[in-house]
């Protein structure tokens, strides 16, 4: 077992308390990127101080954007450059482990005429699929090269004059959609993105708030149309808590006996709340309090209490984009439902930071879970009796936190290798866990 950054989690006890989860990762990335191409100042509060958004900030600084040193829990101000005023960087843009950084920057930089850019990442990111972004950008006139015929990083971009067009995306991916929309800001005419299913819409909401000419048409908002030629104006942004981070506590409170947790000021964007649909199907006991809307994003507090005899669930089809990041913790939940749960149509998880279907099946089996791994999902027999185990996050932040919650249900003490992976999206996860353990 890898002895670096091992965390020991003791099973038993309950979770009690009130907490705020870190700022939404998706909105944190977009506040930096859209603030950078706006005119004037953008004031940001509630930013997620973690590896991925900080990678975005570092890349934007190399492109000439005035972003101050970002400090934990402190607001800051960006001075935007406008849509077409990035400088050619003197060094390679390192996106770290962040697929969002790389894919959104690909869209942003493709139309920066006469300038050249190289994007790379860590070993994991450089194996993730980038062709789903480079191909539509090439249709718009983008000049993009990379390993394996432009489908893997490092990626080289030569800024070029782009033309608006209609693009159908093969998968419902907010990152792919966002890259095309950002490229559309610098393309001639109108750019239209047609998705096979709705994906998270933080980019559309924020672009509209900044003054972009953007419209959503068609069934379930699957056709997004953006026109170039409109300057964006800096805004004040308050970033809500990330529901994908809150999900670990929502499930933990539901499955750890005698638990009750209140999570304050969580983002409740309807393209992100698939986890609540599944919790309803399971029969979880939760209540949403203090609802409000800030900068177009709905927020609220969530009070969750333990329930015995949770029902099994099935996740498939159009709901997947609304809870794609929650599948690892839902796999843990399924182990404690009274019956067989199924996750399908989730092949996208095989090209995340890790192959999350394989990793979760492998690691949960070490606790004694009864899981069948399928090509596009998992079949999980519930009512498991977990024993202690030595498990490994395999450097995946969502796997690390899911295994921590699983360990709470195991008899004895479990060890999680490479537990520090959680810092990618939730730097204070282990501190918050300690506060909640009763």
From Swiss-Prot:
An example Gene Ontology molecular-function term: 3-phosphoshikimate 1-carboxyvinyltransferase activity
CDD domains for this protein: EPSP_synthase (cd01556)
Gene Ontology CC terms, in alphabetical order: cytoplasm
Keywords of the record: Amino-acid biosynthesis, Aromatic amino acid biosynthesis, Cytoplasm, Transferase
Annotated binding of phosphoenolpyruvate, by residue: 25, 99, 128, 175, 356, 398
Annotated 3-phosphoshikimate binding sites: 25-26, 30, 173, 175, 325, 352
Compartment(s): Cytoplasm
Name of a matching Pfam family: EPSP_synthase
Keyword Transcription regulation: no
PANTHER family xref list: AROM/DEHYDROQUINATE SYNTHASE, PENTAFUNCTIONAL AROM POLYPEPTIDE
NCBIfam families named in the record: aroA
Subunit and partners: Monomer.
Protein name according to UniProt: 3-phosphoshikimate 1-carboxyvinyltransferase
Lineage: Bacteria, Bacillati, Cyanobacteriota, Cyanophyceae, Synechococcales
């Amino acid at each position: 077992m890898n002895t670096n950054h091992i965390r020991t989690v003791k099973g038993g006890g309950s979770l009690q308390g009130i907490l705020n989860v870190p700022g939404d990762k998706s909105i944190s990335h977009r506040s930096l990127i859209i603030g950078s191409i706006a005119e004037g100042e953008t004031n940001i509060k509630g930013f997620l101080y973690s590896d991925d958004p900080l990678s975005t900030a570092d890349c934007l600084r190399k492109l000439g954007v005035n972003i101050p040193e970002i400090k934990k829990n402190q607001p800051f101000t960006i001075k935007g450059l406008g849509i077409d005023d990035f400088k050619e960087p003197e060094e390679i843009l390192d996106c770290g482990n962040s697929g969002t950084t790389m894919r959104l920057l690909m869209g942003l930089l493709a139309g920066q005429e006469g300038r050249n850019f190289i994007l790379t990442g860590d070993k994991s990111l450089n194996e993730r699929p980038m062709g789903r972004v480079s191909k539509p950008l090439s249709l718009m006139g983008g000049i993009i090269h990379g390993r394996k015929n432009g489908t893997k990083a490092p990626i080289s971009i030569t800024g070029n004059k782009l033309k608006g067009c209609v693009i159908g995306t093969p998968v419902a991916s907010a990152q792919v959609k966002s890259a095309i929309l950002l490229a559309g800001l610098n393309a001639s005419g109108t750019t239209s993105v047609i998705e096979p299913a709705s994906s998270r819409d933080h980019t559309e909401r924020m672009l509209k708030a900044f003054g972009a000419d953007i419209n959503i048409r068609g069934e379930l908002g699957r056709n997004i149309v953006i026109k170039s030629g409109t300057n964006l104006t800096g805004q004040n942004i308050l970033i809500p808590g990330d529901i994908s981070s809150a999900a670990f506590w929502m499930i933990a409170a539901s499955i750890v006996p005698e638990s009750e947790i209140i999570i304050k000021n969580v983002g409740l964007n309807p393209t992100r709340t698939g986890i609540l649909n599944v919790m309803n199907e399971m029969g979880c006991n939760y209540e949403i309090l203090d609802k409000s809307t800030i900068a177009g994003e709905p927020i609220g507090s969530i009070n969750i209490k333990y329930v015995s005899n949770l029902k099994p669930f099935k996740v498939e089809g159009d709901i997947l984009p609304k809870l794609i990041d929650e599948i690892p913790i839902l796999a843990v939940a399924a182990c404690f439902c009274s019956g067989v749960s199924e996750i399908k149509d989730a092949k996208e998880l095989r090209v995340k930071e890790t192959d999350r279907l394989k990793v979760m099946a492998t690691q949960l089996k070490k606790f004694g879970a009864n899981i069948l791994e399928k090509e596009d999902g998992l079949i999980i027999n519930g009512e498991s009796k977990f024993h202690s185990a030595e498990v490994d996050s395999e450097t995946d932040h969502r796997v690390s936190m899911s295994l921590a919650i699983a360990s709470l249900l195991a008899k004895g003490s479990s060890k999680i290798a490479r537990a520090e992976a959680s810092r990618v999206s939730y730097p204070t996860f282990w501190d918050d866990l300690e506060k909640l353990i009763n």
